[in-house]
Regions:
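Post-cleavage N-terminal segment of exported redox proteins
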Residues: 1-38, 55, 72-133, 173-183, ...
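Sequence/structural segment immediately N-terminal to covalent heme-attachment motifs in c-type
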Residues: 36-56, 119, 123-151, 166
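Generic preference for hydrophobic/aromatic residues in regular secondary structure cores
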Residues: 6-7, 142, 149-152, 213-214
């Protein structure tokens, strides 16, 4: 019987079974790896980050950003910069010192995989105001914000998501960037925001924060 089966095992059939087995092993290993980083990221986030950034990365605390749904590379880069002291975040001083690059990557991937409920983040902020939203949308278009942050403002790679982010955090951050006081942040933003007054930045922040919220 085995000899008969062997005779039927043509090179093409052998290649097919090898390929199918290889694909099966690949997906199995991928699933294991995904489960590993997801578990590790969640385990790291709960004791260290949840108190301020929310259990699933959606902040309800004034001036604290939501991390859910941010691009993985952006989160990863910011975590490294904070750990290395290249970006100043007083509340996080020393918190990341003992985390390895692999730990930070796991955190970044986990937060990037979470869903940002913009309504939750916006709940304690200013209620949506149509006039300010329109003004902010106009400012965003004139400043070409969608060129880097994407037309949806969901961010990409090293560029952060603006859609649904906390309004107060966005406003404070843009003021710091405009005034050249955002140490460790993208210097391009300083020139982009230069010349905008506080009211214009408030409208921009209001507009971005309401994207994705229910009417």
């Amino acid at each position: 019987v085995f000899r008969s089966l062997a005779m039927k095992a043509t090179p093409s059939r052998v290649a097919f079974f090898i390929a199918r087995s290889t694909v099966g092993v690949f997906f199995a290993l991928s699933a294991i790896a995904q489960t590993s980083w997801a578990t590790e990221g969640a385990d790291r986030a709960k004791p260290m980050c949840a108190a301020c950034h929310g259990t699933l990365g959606v902040s309800t605390i004034p001036s604290i950003p939501s991390l859910a749904g941010q691009p993985k590379v952006f989160i990863e880069n910011q975590l490294v910069m904070i750990r290395e002291g290249l970006r100043e975040v007083p509340a996080m001083t020393g918190m990341l010192d003992k985390l390895s690059d692999a730990d930070l990557t796991a955190l970044a991937r986990w937060y990037a995989d979470q869903t940002l409920d913009a309504g939750v983040a916006q709940a304690s902020a200013t209620p949506p105001q149509s006039a300010r939203i329109a003004a902010g949308a106009t400012m965003a278009k004139q400043a070409l914000c969608g060129t880097c942050h994407l037309p949806t403002y969901l961010g990409q790679s090293q560029v952060p998501r603006l859609a649904g982010q906390r309004e107060d955090y966005l406003q404070q951050t843009m003021v710091l960037m405009r005034d050249g006081k955002a140490i460790g942040r993208d210097s391009i933003m300083s020139s982009t925001l230069r010349g905008m007054n506080d009211e214009q930045l408030r409208d921009l922040a209001h507009y971005f924060s309401t994207i994705g919220t229910k009417p």
